[in-house]
Amino acid sequence: MDTELLKTFLEVSRTRHFGRAAESLYLTQSAVSFRIRQLENQLGVNLFTRHRNNIRLTAAGEKLLPYAETLMSTWQAARKEVAHTSRHNEFSIGASASLWECMLNQWLGRLYQNQDVHTGLQFEARIAQRQSLVKQLHERQLDLLITTEAPKMDEFCSQLLGYFTLALYTSAPSKLKGDLNYLRLEWGPDFQQHEAGLIGADEVPILTTSSAELAQQQIAMLNGCTWLPVSWARKKGGLHTVVDSTTLSRPLYAIWLQNSDKNALIRDLLKINVLDEVY
């Protein structure tokens, strides 16, 4: 039996709501419904009664519940033991491309320079979208996530690492927003909520990317502007702030599993400044 089906069953039984279960599992609601139907077809019984938003376990669902919990607990323990033997010296860090390019690349270098912390460790620098990395963290496929937005889930620990400043940059001096095309560099879902007010509600990005390097290289060719970290942009050179723009402060968080067996190691690694300028 597919353990993902049991995992979905347990989440729906816990939340009694397909939408909330989908949110917790980082799936669409239709995917959750499909998994429940698959499990019901395999068992030949209905597991839930559905009356509008009132979802309850059937008698068969109630009987399955303790077995599903035991099976998932055993499976998680097995995965943990196998993973521990195969990757006890490995440590994976996940973040978006722009965070790696603008600040985490330098931090990784500092980790390697600090012999006391990294002795024997094999680091993996993983690049992906935040939602994918949160899922990997939840499933113990990732050790540490660096992000601009802390997930609101009880099983995660979080540490505020500091703040960095974003400014709107272009390739030539004395430019106004109205004269430039907008390139959207992804800085997290909460940043996008502010974008309309910062750029203009009717501004359609000419390019969307998660890479700061790519965005920086394209702004001259596209007569564009994009939000970049101030400290990084100054080091790159050849960039100018847009005259009629503002700056924005963004938080940076470290996220890891509360019951991670690498808790002590994570806290040691985070003693080495992630940001060049912390305030």
Swiss-Prot record:
Belongs to the LysR transcriptional regulatory family. Residues 1-58 form the HTH lysR-type domain. The lineage of its organism: Bacteria, Pseudomonadati, Pseudomonadota, Gammaproteobacteria, Enterobacterales. NCBIfam families: PRK03601.1. InterPro entries: LTTR, LysR_subst-bd, Tscrpt_reg_HTH_HdfR, Tscrpt_reg_HTH_LysR, WH-like_DNA-bd_sf, WH_DNA-bd_sf. This is HTH-type transcriptional regulator HdfR. One of its GO terms (biological process) is negative regulation of DNA-templated transcription. GO terms for molecular function: DNA binding; DNA-binding transcription factor activity. Keywords: DNA-binding, Repressor, Transcription, Transcription regulation. Coiled coil: none annotated. Residues 18-37 bind DNA. It comes from Escherichia coli O45:K1 (strain S88 / ExPEC). It comes from the Bacteria. Negatively regulates the transcription of the flagellar master operon flhDC by binding to the upstream region of the operon.
